[in-house]
Amino acid sequence: IVRRGCCSDPRCAWRCG
C-alpha cells in the first residue's frame, strides 16, 4: 500500500509503478 505523495518521493516512487 502506497500513501499519496509516495509517488513524488524517489525512495518510494518505485513502488508506485
Swiss-Prot record:
- Which superkingdom does the taxonomy of this entry point to? Eukaryota
GO cellular component terms listed in the entry, alphabetical order: extracellular region; host cell postsynaptic membrane
**InterPro entries linked:** Conotoxin_a-typ_CS
Q: Does the keyword Secreted apply?
A: yes
Q: Which PROSITE patterns match?
A: ALPHA_CONOTOXIN
Chain positions of site Important for binding to human alpha-7 nAChR = D9, P10, R11, A13, W14
Keywords per UniProt: Acetylcholine receptor inhibiting toxin, Amidation, Cleavage on pair of basic residues, Disulfide bond, Ion channel impairing toxin, Neurotoxin, Postsynaptic neurotoxin, Secreted, Toxin
Q: Has UniProt tagged this entry with the keyword Acyltransferase?
A: no
Where does this polypeptide localize? Secreted
**Modification Cysteine amide occurs at:** C16
Q: Name one GO molecular function term.
A: acetylcholine receptor inhibitor activity
Leader sequence segment: none
* Cysteine disulfide partners in this protein: C6-C12, C6-C16, C7-C12, C7-C16
Q: In which tissues is it expressed?
A: Expressed by the venom duct.
| PTM comment text | Not hydroxylated. Hydroxylation improves its folding but impairs its activity against target receptors.
Q: Which stretches of the sequence are propeptide?
A: 1-4
The family annotation for this protein states:
Belongs to the conotoxin A superfamily.
Additional facts recorded: This toxin is a substrate for a multienzyme complex that regulates its folding and assembly. This complex is composed of protein-disulfide isomerase (PDI), peptidyl-prolyl cis-trans isomerase (PPI) and immunoglobulin-binding protein (BiP). PDI catalyzes the oxidation and reduction of disulfide bonds. Oxidative folding rates are further increased in the presence of PPI with the maximum effect observed in the presence of both enzymes. In contrast, BiP is only observed to assist folding in the presence of microsomes, suggesting that additional cofactors are involved. Negative results: does not inhibit alpha-2-beta-2, alpha-4-beta-2, alpha-2-beta-4, alpha-3-beta-4, and alpha-4-beta-4 subunits. Also has no effect on muscle nAChRs alpha-1-beta-1-delta-epsilon.
Q: What does this protein do?
A: Alpha-conotoxins act on postsynaptic membranes, they bind to the nicotinic acetylcholine receptors (nAChR) and thus inhibit them. This toxin blocks neuronal alpha-3-beta-2/CHRNA3-CHRNB2 (human and rat), alpha-7/CHRNA7 (human and rat), and alpha-3-beta-4/CHRNA3-CHRNB4 (human) nAChRs. Acts voltage-independently. Competes with alpha-bungarotoxin for binding to the receptor. Binds to a different site than alpha-conotoxin ImII. Is highly active against the neuromuscular receptor in frog. Also exhibits inhibition of D.melanogaster alpha-7 nAChRs.
Domain observations = The cysteine framework is I (CC-C-C). Alpha4/3 pattern.
Report what the protein is called: Alpha-conotoxin ImI
Organism listed in the record: Conus imperialis (Imperial cone)
